[in-house]
């Protein structure tokens, strides 16, 4: 089981066909969360270099709260401890943030809402987001996300959480 898997109660598609907003139960905490997610446009290989994977970028909040946290489900082993992720929008420079890794060792997440806000501010107004991570004892992997419609989808997520 992937830690933190969202079991949807309702799904609302955002303005862009790339972003999906849903409200459901988090399988690891059993709490209701609202989530904005997108699968990567590019693939990476699993830790055995046999399968192509599309990591999923998610922004989450709990209804009734304003804090948004970011996470990426890489669907492959990343690390058993905190790791640095690089985020680059369009032709800019990488911004490196130290993120935590969940118990499955496959999901990285921001340690705080303030850290997630850095990523949100970086992504707003951009067209493409590149994310780079170096799995433990492996070569770096990079994935790309389409930021078209992100601003509107983020507004929908915030609306879902403010209720």
Please describe what each predicted stretch is:
Residues 1-8:
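Bacterial N-terminal signal peptides
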Residues 13-163:
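A generic "folded-domain core" signal
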């Amino acid at each position: 089981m992937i830690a933190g898997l969202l079991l949807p109660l309702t799904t609302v598609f955002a303005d862009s066909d790339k972003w999906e907003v849903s409200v459901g139960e988090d399988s690891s905490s059993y709490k209701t969360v609202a989530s904005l997610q997108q699968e990567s446009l590019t693939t990476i290989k699993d830790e055995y270099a046999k399968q192509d994977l599309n990591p999923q970028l998610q922004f989450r909040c709990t209804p009734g709260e304003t804090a948004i946290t970011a996470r990426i489900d890489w669907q492959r082993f990343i690390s058993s401890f905190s790791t640095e992720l690089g985020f680059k929008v369009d032709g800019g420079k990488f911004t490196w943030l130290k993120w935590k890794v969940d118990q499955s060792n496959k999901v990285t997440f921001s340690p705080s809402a303030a850290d997630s806000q850095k990523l949100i501010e970086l992504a707003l107004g951009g067209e493409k987001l590149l994310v780079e991570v170096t799995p433990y004892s492996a070569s770096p992997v990079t994935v790309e996300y389409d930021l078209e419609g992100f601003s509107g989808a983020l507004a929908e997520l915030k609306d879902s959480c403010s209720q």
